[in-house]
Amino acid sequence: MSKLFWAMLAFISRLPVPSRWSQGLDFEQYSRGIVMFPFIGLILGGISGLIFILLQPWCGIPLAALFCILALALLTGGFHLDGLADTCDGIFSARRRERMLEIMRDSRLGTHGGLALIFVLLAKILVVSELALRGTPMLAALAAACAAGRGSAVLLMYRHRYAREEGLGNVFIGKVSGRQTCITLGLAVIVATVLLLGMQGLATMVVTLAAIFILGQLLKRTLGGQTGDTLGAAIELGELIFLLALL
């Protein structure tokens, strides 16, 4: 199980993980690591929250919010943000399903993808700033948001089909069991509830899960399934929705 954790941490972050710590795991086994997603989010969000706490006394709330969101993007190598941009480029192209999927595979950034990145990153910075001004404990809020975003992404994996024939998302989409889904969601709810001291965390998590479930159904109807890009989009939007629900 520890090998699986390190493999997942290396897969969805840019944190330096020695390859020997996950040695012997096949890529096809990665679907079992979905239950680790909330804990990985907890680590990444915790680092982002620490950066906010350290910088706030020195440069103020707005710049601390900017740098903690920048750190979060760097910690993931922009992996999920790239998925968000590709998803928006495809969905908002208003083309046929097959053409949408082709556009999503194009490495070039389109207008819709660029606008989505600007909106989501700016919204995160503004929401983090507002939460801090309201006295919200930012270490807990950011850690919980990242755990919620990654945990809720399982809703786009369970009983969904992969919209393409190949790709990174194929290791998760349609391969996750009901038991793994329940454990992943349960862990995300527990993390949010513990960090945010009870009902606020639980209510915020319910809002996030409902929004991501609806997003998954809309993407399924539009694309005929999910891709690695839509998983990245769900994680980014899940984080933002969680933070917004805390306001």
From Swiss-Prot:
**Quick one: signal sequence residues?**
none
EC numbers listed for it are 2.7.8.26
Source domain of life: Bacteria
- Cofactor(s) this protein requires: Mg(2+)
User: Which cellular compartments is it found in?
Assistant: Cell inner membrane
Among the GO biological process terms of this entry, one is: cobalamin biosynthetic process
Catalytic activities: alpha-ribazole + adenosylcob(III)inamide-GDP = adenosylcob(III)alamin + GMP + H(+); alpha-ribazole 5'-phosphate + adenosylcob(III)inamide-GDP = adenosylcob(III)alamin 5'-phosphate + GMP + H(+)
Function noted in UniProt: Joins adenosylcobinamide-GDP and alpha-ribazole to generate adenosylcobalamin (Ado-cobalamin). Also synthesizes adenosylcobalamin 5'-phosphate from adenosylcobinamide-GDP and alpha-ribazole 5'-phosphate.
Official protein name in the record: Adenosylcobinamide-GDP ribazoletransferase
Q: Which organism is it from?
A: Salmonella typhi
